[in-house]
Amino acid sequence: MRATVLSLFWMVTLVIIVRAQIPESHDEQTILSLPLFPADIVRNHIPLTQALGAVGASVEGGFALFGLELHSTDGQEPIVSVDLPPESRFEDGLRQVMGQIPGYEYEVTSEHMINIYPRGAKKNPADLLNTPVPKFDAVDVDPGGVLTRPADFIPELALRLRPKTSAGPQPSGYGGSVLRSNVTITLHLKDTTVRQILNAASEAMEQLPQEYQPVGWTYLFQPDPESLIGGKHSWAFLFSAPRNWKQHSAKPGPNA
């Protein structure tokens, strides 16, 4: 009887250990294991967004988009380096970059989307990207506009960016570059947040033709205690998809 109990104990313990080594989701397991271009990838002392773009553009057999939230007292990006040997995987590049920006964490949110933000930011109700949006409907809109001028499309965000002494909305920061294209996307979301809307706009670009590479987004917050809206809020694109991204965006059918 004792031997049976001990056997069961070790079986249960083994199952727990094995489960702890399994990635949290299929999406995380898939995207992190993607191989990179089989050559040295070296970039020295470059802005964080460029480093993420370099790692993403080297992905083979898939693609990755980033949603990056940065908090910076001087309005500048962290400077990092990338030094990856051949046979590296996407996870190696991501972890190398993350190791140079202490205080930040990443989350795989979907098949192709990775969010990076200050530790604890996602649970902070004061964070602008966590602004609740009960209903979001955008029909035939330029995805670049949503990513770089989100306050123009999200009334709840525009309200947060309105100084308390102002009679009308006055978004702070800049809108970034404009994606000049003739393509549009349509989004219908309920009980969402600004962060999730930005993610959805990037993910919707997966349906675009080959010549339109999907892009991620960057939100830069520069705190200013004297500002009526807490500081400067800026949005821009984050390029990271390889040129052959479309070859890997279509999911195989049931008979594949």
Task: Spell out what each predicted region is.
Residues 2-5, 9-256:
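N-terminal targeting/assembly segments of extracytoplasmic apparatus and virion spike/baseplate proteins
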